[in-house]
Amino acid sequence: MRPLFSHIKKFFCLSLSLLICSACIDEIRLDIDADQAKVAIDGFISDSLRVHSIALSYSSVFGVGNDNIQPPISGANVGIRDGAGNFFSFEESSEEPGVYERLMAGEVGQSYQLEINLPDGREIRSRAIEMPRNNELMGIEYEQIERTFINTAGNVSTTIELILKIDSELDAQKRPFFRWRVGGQYEFHENYPMALSTKWCYISETLDFNQLELLDAREIEGNELRNKRIFSMPLDSRFAWQYCFHIRQFSMSEEEYIYWSNIQEILNTGGSLFDPPPGTVKGNLFNPADENDQILGFFSVASVSYKRYFANPDILNRFVDPKCSAIPFRPQFPECRDCSTVLGSELEKPDYWLP
């Protein structure tokens, strides 16, 4: 998983993952006014031992040049300093220019500050944030709701909505601020008329695109959060064989909660994260030598609790019609002949997959 601010940056510029083109690539001249482009930071550290990354880019100004083109910033010195004075240097990725990486785990109760020296001589810092205590994600449940509507042909149709709900512990001494992310992965079987050889694919997808699910737990009584709805989606052909939800619960600072709440307000007004924001949402990044140098993004310090949840026809107690069929008069789709062409598709079965 990419850093937290990638959840906003990627909303602007990509969906499931970065597509990196290889082979022969013609030079592209980016029509971006350097005087108007701003530095955008995508940074995140958690209490999990993993490769953390900090992504640097120039964010184009909406309405100027080619909107949403974000050229990476290479050659910067990037690192994180903790409250004890230890400095953790990040190295630029050889595969992704402008992305700086390091294997590390943050420590709960310790504070962390991002320090960046850009190639043009500017310094960028974040305000120090203390790593919050991890609040354990205890349980996951689902609910199925039938919804009836009149379709475009004037006929009555019924859809099934699958709702995910979670239970979590709550720190009694210091109430957490939560954000949830939900990803998905499903099993896909090729099938078509007179098929001779077919494959099974395992397809990953981003589910909460353009959605934010937040909670200020100071509003909750007791030491547990119960039946909190965090996500819903239609129960469709993706559940025909098996679906796996990847659920991450982030315990974050109040400052970060306010940041994402401001982003959420933009979405709730009917806008999209692809739309020009009505006003710049201010993060925790700054240039100490120039208060007018606006730095976009937020350096996140958050603890993470993770769980997987499987759903299939047996668990759901419901038959789900597969997308692909060997019956000639049924609709036929290209991926039913070659599912490896689907974005996010892999042929290798995950080792955690249920039999």
What is each stretch, according to the model?
Residues 20-23:
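C-terminal motif of bacterial Sec signal peptides marking the signal peptidase cleavage site
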Residues 25-355:
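A sequence/structural signal for flexible, mid-protein segments enriched
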Residues 1-2, 25:
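N-terminal hydrophobic targeting signals that begin at the initiator methionine
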Residues 2-12:
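Bacterial N-terminal signal peptides that target proteins for export
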